[in-house]
Structure formats: C-alpha cells, structure tokens
Amino acid sequence: MLGQSSLVGYSNTQAANRVFVYEVSGLRQTDANENSAHDIRRSGSVFIKVPYARMNDEMRRISRLGGTIVNIRPYQADSNEQN
C-alpha cells in the first residue's frame, strides 16, 4: 500500500515470536476470578509469560486483579522458568 514500509511485515513477524515475562506482585482473589481452576497467591511474586501481541491486554488484566507489575523482561527459552 501507498505510504507503508516494506519492513512492516518483517517487523510484525519478528514481534509475533517475542515473549516477555512479567513479574507481578499483589494479585488478589476476586469474584471475577474465583471460579478459575487455581487460586491466586496473595503474597510473593508470580511470573507470567506474555506474547508481545498480548502485552497491553495482560497489563490491563493484572491491573483489574489488583496486581503490580514489578519487572518485565524478555523470555529466554533455555532459562529455568517455573511456569
């Protein structure tokens, strides 16, 4: 299309493959998530793997659940993650 860079498709493909790890503290159990299959920890940090395309949605979800994002870092597939 007129006005679009030829690199747009390449960067979208590259971004689609990127995954980040959110370190989140302060998540709480609420009526909205009470029916989930697992409880949410009230203390400590939780690590959540998030694809690049879902980062904004996940930030909103964490905020709704009362969590605070402490750290965001790129996911390393060869690291010893406990997810």
From Swiss-Prot:
GO cellular component, one term: phycobilisome
Primary localization: membrane
Subcellular localization(s) per the UniProt record: Cellular thylakoid membrane
Family annotation (PROSITE patterns): CPCD_LIKE
Domain CpcD-like: 17-75
Keyword ATP-binding on entry: no
Parts forming coiled coils: none
Listed GO biological process terms: photosynthesis
Membrane topology: Peripheral membrane protein
Key words, A-Z: Antenna complex, Membrane, Photosynthesis, Phycobilisome, Thylakoid
Record function comment: Rod linker protein, associated with phycocyanin. Linker polypeptides determine the state of aggregation and the location of the disk-shaped phycobiliprotein units within the phycobilisome and modulate their spectroscopic properties in order to mediate a directed and optimal energy transfer.
Subunit structure comment from the entry: Part of 2 PBS rod complexes, the conventional CpcG-PBS rod and a photosystem I-specific CpcL-PBS rod, both of which include ferredoxin--NADP reductase (petH). CpcG-PBS has on average 3 stacked phycocyanin hexamers (PC, CpcA and CpcB). Linker CpcG connects the PC stack to the thylakoid, the hexamers are linked by 1 copy of CpcC1, 1 copy of CpcC2 and the stack is terminated by a single copy of CpcD. The CpcL-PBS has on average 5 stacked phycocyanin hexamers (PC, CpcA and CpcB).
Family under the similarity heading: Belongs to the phycobilisome linker protein family.
Protein name according to UniProt: Phycobilisome 8.9 kDa linker polypeptide, phycocyanin-associated, rod
The organism of origin for this protein: Synechocystis sp. (strain ATCC 27184 / PCC 6803 / Kazusa)
